[in-house]
Regions:
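Contiguous domain-boundary segments centered on the initiation and propagation of an alpha-helix
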Residues: 142-173
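Structural beta-strand/beta-sheet cores of well-ordered domains, especially the beta-sheet scaffolds
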Residues: 35-37, 60, 156, 168
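Glycine-rich phosphate/pyrophosphate-binding loop regions near the starts of catalytic domains
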Residues: 40-100, 110
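N-terminal amphipathic/basic leader segments beginning at the initiator methionine
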Residues: 1-53, 57
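Short capping/connector residues at structural and topological boundaries
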Residues: 67, 130-131, 163
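Conserved small/polar residues in nucleotide/adenosyl-binding loops
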Residues: 175-177
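A glycine-rich phosphate/pyrophosphate-binding beta-strand-loop-alpha-helix module
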Residues: 77-86, 90-145
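Residue-level detector of flexible, active-site-proximal loop/helix-junction positions
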Residues: 46, 125, 165
Length: 177
């Protein structure tokens, strides 16, 4: 793959964020031997907000995650975000919805929490069923690798046609009066 001439010379130094841990894995969703899966676990009690596509035909992961914002979650449940690249899990009908349910259920089982506290995102090929087992079988490995760092690996895991990983950071100080 040819790297864009606009690519920065290095990935920026992104600091860990207290209360968040992440891990990546090579699930082989579309390509073998490529990091294509990212998981983020937020401590129990984390408040969440999200921005979703305005597309009139959102995929099953978007539908699930929109509902997850409204579902009641036990106060001691961690929040999870699971993102895969290689398959968008869109326009495969019931198979898309089944893959979402299996992924959220297994993520909650392995990482702790409830399926309703799992947010899902998929990017990649449209119209092909997603084999959720390729993702869920990596969860034990990812759980044992959870760490506060890993932003560059996370950026690489969600690349589709990108030629380089992208990252940015900004620090903000707020005064409470």
């Amino acid at each position: 793959m040819t790297i864009s001439p606009f690519a920065p010379k290095r990935f920026p130094n992104l600091p860990p964020i207290a209360g968040f841990e992440m891990a990546t894995a090579k699930a082989g969703v579309k390509y073998a031997n490529r990091v294509d899966l990212w998981g983020l676990r937020a401590v129990a009690g984390t408040q969440v907000a999200a921005v979703f596509t305005k597309n009139q035909c959102p995929g099953a992961p978007v539908d699930w995650s929109r509902r997850a914002l409204t579902w009641p979650v036990k106060p001691n449940a961690p929040r999870l975000v699971i993102v895969n690249s290689g398959n968008a899990n869109v326009f495969a009908g019931q198979k898309s919805r089944d893959a979402v349910l299996e992924t959220a259920t297994q993520a909650a089982k392995i990482f702790g929490g409830e399926p309703e506290a799992v947010f899902l995102a998929s990017t990649g090929v449209i119209g092909e069923p997603l084999d959720a087992s390729k993702i869920t079988e990596k969860f034990p490995q990812m759980k044992s690798a959870l760490d506060a760092g890993g932003w560059e690996a996370a950026a690489r895991a969600i690349m589709t046609t990108d030629t380089y990983a992208k990252g940015s950071t900004q620090e903000l100080s707020l005064i409470h009066i």
